[in-house]
Amino acid sequence: MIQTFFEVGKTKNFSALRDIQIDSEEFSSLSDVPPYSLKNYSESIALEELRFSSISDYDYEIKNEKTSIFGTTGIVTFELNQKGMLVDNKAYTGQHITINGRATFVLIKEDKWKIVHYHLDKISN
């Protein structure tokens, strides 16, 4: 499921984001990209779509993944390397980016596992 989240950056199949995240008041996300506030489901989906649509030639690597299961709750932590071309469609320009970061995803299991919270942040070079 975590790979599905980041594969959207390659496939641009944004409906997959709705399939793997729970649409409820309990959903939340945080990141080091503005806005810095705690985001709800609809805000997170909109920002994820904007981010992934703005990066062409997207690729990622998940390293040092640790998964812990506590009944119907799962916690996944890992280091994340992302790269691609950040595209400005209005100015017809692009900039190569490489982001080294870390991530925590909290999952809950109802009928199937879904993301209920995630936190992404960059590691300073």
Segments the model singles out, each with a brief description of its role:
Residues 72-84, 88:
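A short hydrophobic beta-strand element
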Residues 98-125:
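Short beta-strand edge/turn micro-motifs at domain boundaries
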Residues 48, 62-67, 82, 101-111:
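Hydrophobic/aromatic beta-strand elements that line small-molecule binding cavities or substrate pockets
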Residues 14-69, 79:
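A solvent-exposed, acidic/Ser-Thr-rich amphipathic alpha-helical stretch
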Residues 1-13:
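Short, aromatic-enriched amphipathic alpha-helices that serve as compact interaction elements
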Residues 54-55, 83-96:
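Short, cysteine-centered beta-strand-loop-beta hairpins and adjacent loop/turn segments enriched
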